[in-house]
A protein has these predicted regions:
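Helix-start (N-cap) detector for alpha-helical repeat units in TPR-like alpha-solenoids
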Residues: 71-72, 119-120, 164-165, 203-204, ...
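Structural signature of tandem alpha-helical TPR/SEL1-like repeats
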Residues: 52-55, 91-106, 136-154, 181-194, ...
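Short coil/turn linking the two alpha-helices of tandem helical-hairpin repeats
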Residues: 47, 83-92, 126, 131-141, ...
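Canonical positions in the second alpha-helix
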Residues: 63, 111, 155-156, 194-195, ...
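Terminal, low-structured helical/coil segments at or just beyond the last alpha-helical repeat
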Residues: 204, 208-211, 215-247
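Structural marker of alpha-solenoid helical repeat scaffolds
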Residues: 66, 114, 159, 197-198, ...
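N-terminal leader/linker segments that initiate helical-solenoid repeat arrays
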Residues: 26-87, 91
Length: 247
């Protein structure tokens, strides 16, 4: 749980205000007043703008220094590090991407040490192990991290089987795993659709659904899914890159 220390409102408001000052055109979510930190993390996710990410990372590290036992702060830091990973992968900077995924893993594992009942944290950990496979030599990284992906997704599902992030991560597991080790494109589509049934606003999940349809050979459904993603988040370079790859 988040700390109730008196310094928190000022720090959280500062984090969100700093992001809005960097991206003044970004609309403030309705929930920003109730959860300024969550709103700041979501604003950074939508754009993957590096200055936003750097500002938010600095704010989170300051909060963690003052509240080192707050599991939620470590989870937010892990998310921000994953967004850095996306940025570096887009640039094809494999070294920086490798450092970012390791930092994300460290933060997420610390979150789970403090609170092992977070479905979001276990789900993110599964995704990060999957990213380790994609960044490494699949012949060696697959056997090392593949079982961990499956284990963390199972933990997340046991904790919250109505969580859209949990279903999306399971979909990525089915999509990215080789068929001989349990990969299943049809199950990945089913999982992504289940995620979207719980939360239809998840643009990234629609991109992954498009990737599944593309792998299945259904380009029409792939284009439709990614067009919905672009409509939901037109400012995301990751979404735009996915759309371009399907054209």
């Amino acid at each position: 749980m988040r700390s109730s220390k008196s310094s928190y409102p000022r720090l959280l408001a500062g984090a969100y205000a700093a992001l809005l000052s960097i991206a003044p055109g970004a609309p403030a979510p309705v929930s920003a007043a109730d959860d300024p930190l969550g709103a700041a993390v979501e604003a950074a996710r939508k754009t993957h703008e590096e200055k936003q990410l750097q500002s938010l990372k600095a704010q989170l590290e300051q909060m963690i220094a003052q509240n080192p036992n707050d599991a939620g702060l470590y989870l937010d830091l892990a998310k921000v590090q994953e967004y850095f990973l996306d940025v570096y992968e887009t640039r094809r900077d494999k070294k920086a991407a490798g450092e970012a995924v390791d930092k994300a893993l460290d933060a997420d594992q610390r979150c789970i040490q403090l609170n092992d009942k977070s479905a979001d944290a276990h789900s993110l950990l599964a995704d990060l192990y999957g990213r380790k496979i994609s960044l490494g030599n699949a012949m060696f990284a697959g056997p090392k991290f593949g079982p961990k992906v499956k284990e963390e997704n199972a933990k997340a599902m046991a904790l919250d089987d109505k969580n859209p992030r949990v279903w999306a991560s399971l979909g990525r597991q089915y999509l990215m795993t080789p068929k001989m080790f349990g990969g299943d494109v049809a199950k990945s589509i089913e999982s992504f659709q289940k995620s979207l049934a719980f939360d239809s606003s998840r643009d990234e999940t629609r991109v992954w659904l498009a990737k599944s349809f593309q792998k299945q050979g259904d380009r029409a459904k792939a284009r439709d899914a990614v067009q919905h993603a672009v409509a939901l988040n037109p400012d995301s370079p990751w979404v735009r890159n996915a759309a371009n790859s399907l054209n």
